Amino acid sequence: MTLNPQRVRASSTTAHGWLDVGRCEDFLVHEARLLDEARFDEWLALFTEDARYWVPSEPGQASPHDTVSLMYDDRRLLETRVRRLASPRIYSQEPRSRTSRIVTNVSLADAGPDGGSVVRSKFVLIECRREQQRLFAGTYFHRLAVRDGAIRIAMKRVDLVNCDAPMDGLVIPF
């Protein structure tokens, strides 16, 4: 399951049955807060069991299978990533990063065949660690689904504005 931005058509503020822009915005702000507060186990719980998390390495990349990606995780790899972030021995996070995310321009796109909705938003992420500050910006595409009465992430695609630029290690989830 992948999300191709060229196939996502915005539907502005219309609702897709169970979901409207306000509810999507609340969910995305909640996700950003969990990440900024390093509550990674709670963040992981937002994903479905068959979820994918994808950060393409090329602008407009249509598939994670055709070329290398900055990140392409299934649920199992996400669990490993979260375990590493929780470890006191993760050298790349000594001291731990402090982050601040801004999520904006939230819009609903066409509902998927599974009844889930694709939500598009813009983001800015600032990561501070030691004396360094890094800035990331781009577009999120979330395919959301309802599981056991709660909104869950079935797919998250992160299109970085500078995805094809050289980068130091990417440890913190976007």
Model features per residue range: what roles?
Residues 2-49:
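Short, low-complexity N-terminal intrinsically disordered segments enriched in polar/charged residues
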Residues 2-8, 100, 107-174:
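A beta-strand edge to alpha-helix "cap/lid" segment located at domain peripheries
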Residues 16-19, 66, 132:
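Conserved aromatic-histidine-acidic binding/catalytic patches
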Residues 22-26, 69, 76, 135:
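A generic "alpha-helical surface" signal
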Residues 31-33, 89-96, 130-131:
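Short helix-to-loop capping/linker segments positioned immediately adjacent to catalytic or ligand/cofactor-binding
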Residues 49-119:
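A solvent-exposed, acidic/Ser-Thr-rich amphipathic alpha-helical stretch
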